[in-house]
């Protein structure tokens, strides 16, 4: 089964390039650990009306991997550098409904 985890929050830095650099460094550090736990994709989005509003959509092949990764203090420390406050994290499971 396929799972999606969304992470939505306000970026800490007002400078978008600084936020991107922090995000990309986080992915470089945490990405290999996530992939080893079943993370098969990561996409980052910014709200076009407020580019400090961030949304990540991560695709997983299991539910245990993201739960374990999100509980890791290393990821918490990275989130503290990236976000102004705690981001909202939501878990979704693929439905066996028609999709395209």
Per-region residue spans from a language model:
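Short S/T/G/P-rich N-terminal loop/turn motif that feeds into the first structured element of a domain
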Residues: 1-71, 81, 85-100
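Active-site phosphate/pyrophosphate- and oxyanion-stabilizing loops and adjacent acidic/basic residues
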Residues: 77
